[in-house]
């Protein structure tokens, strides 16, 4: 791919960041006695370490460069010490001090990585260590504090942790992982800036020792305060079932990926070892490890494309402490910091952007990079299916950066052709638009069950008589008029229901499915579109709650009838409930149809002026208020079935009045040429 042809990139670290990580800690050549750092029993001598931390002249801040320089020999001694131990000795001496973390079994694995001397494995170990440490420190914070800071930097600066571990100890951690002015090991690795050879292994060894030392300090604190450390539960990734688009990665696909990795311009040569280890981890069923490496390298590669397309080559490098890094947040944004259009989304296309937003950014998506980097996921339970999706997407992305002749060869493989086809057809699964479609269809299914609810035959005639009143008839008349109006705004096809007393159960679900399968643009949705979606989703959720309550109440009353435990008043209430249900079923179905049609035309809201928009928002919020009241009236506690009829009549009048103003989105949108087949 010509877009990335240029001089080979030898580092993604800016000069000063490269200097502090790769050079500064090696300037002092003095030997440091390991016995002054850690005892034979594995007890950390914190004073030796904290004495190496330098401060500015005013003593108001840390001298990060001076501290890294002085800590260099200490890290060297610790690294040599660990390499001199057998794994058994390491575990006997240090394993007890990792129990305070929520992932103590990680540390013997890191020890193995250190002994292997393989740079990518050591970098991966540091990433996992920093995420584990962050999670554990958050648990400690909650011994005293109430709301744990989201960023590690803010966590390390908190008074709560200083109270537990001392400020001098927290300053040591800041030098290693807590500030862009220091080594900043967490961020340069998790954001894919550091190549394997650029992370000195001794810093990994030092982080192991610091974690053990923190465990020792915490034990003393807990003994003195009589407090007990509780670990927060790991989170479960959300909406994963919706995100499984690609089939399982086969050995054939893996072999193609291995070949493409060597030839795709997307991968920086200095980063290739990470990709190679990622595949090794996948084959050995270490799916979280594979995902971590893929995510960091997707960020690296996309940052390179971003910097090239937007002609800002310096954005490829780590920023200095005075500027922001270029991370996924900026890479996947619509605009650059200066307000210009980001060229990357235009180059990648909507399907690829939607995939990345689904996995990384959407609040209702799995946000796997965030959760992995903050230590919120149990790595042992990370699913193969999730890693499958990342691997398949990565292959399709890499193929965009090989020459056309090679691409043609790979496309001849049916497995590769299928992945490309699926990737090109991808649409968001985590955007509020998709979630609303899911809600509508789920709620429709729930309401359809009402027709199957049992009702005593001997009560049917009485229930029908209750329905024959002026207000109920007025409701049915309004439903017919509203439905007629909505059906005139179907995409091209028009169909009018004449008999709402007999809901067309065969065609109604199909109609909603067709509407919910209509593509709606989701990438970079305007704020007002998202505001309307929030209200529509709330309406749908209240409809679901009503449906659930109706089902539960009906089944309970029928059981009581069969068991002959219904008292006289309860029997009358049962009749009113059944009469109400026969009205609520078409009303809720009408609301779902309205939601689906407004959703198809959701972007028409951008054409409203401020006054029109506020009027429209008031309208949809009035429907929300109605459904919220329905939830209250149909609850087991209130059981006000008669009142739902008056409530419904008032709501339908408001809906019809607003409809006559022709200010709904269906009235503003241009006619679609797509067909809804009934």
From Swiss-Prot:
Transport among keywords: no
Segments crossing the lipid bilayer: 390-410, 587-607
Location of this chain's protein in the cell: Endoplasmic reticulum membrane
Predominant subcellular localization, coarse grouping: endoplasmic reticulum
Swiss-Prot/TrEMBL keywords: Developmental protein, Disease variant, Endoplasmic reticulum, Membrane, Transmembrane, Transmembrane helix
InterPro entries listed in its UniProt record: DUF4209, ERMARD
Membrane association type: Multi-pass membrane protein
One Gene Ontology CC term in the entry: endoplasmic reticulum membrane
Function: May play a role in neuronal migration during embryonic development.
Disease: Periventricular nodular heterotopia 6: A form of periventricular nodular heterotopia, a disorder resulting from a defect in the pattern of neuronal migration in which ectopic collections of neurons lie along the lateral ventricles of the brain or just beneath, contiguously or in isolated patches. PVNH6 results in delayed psychomotor development, delayed speech, strabismus, and onset of seizures with hypsarrhythmia in early infancy.
Protein name according to UniProt: Endoplasmic reticulum membrane-associated RNA degradation protein
The encoding gene: ERMARD
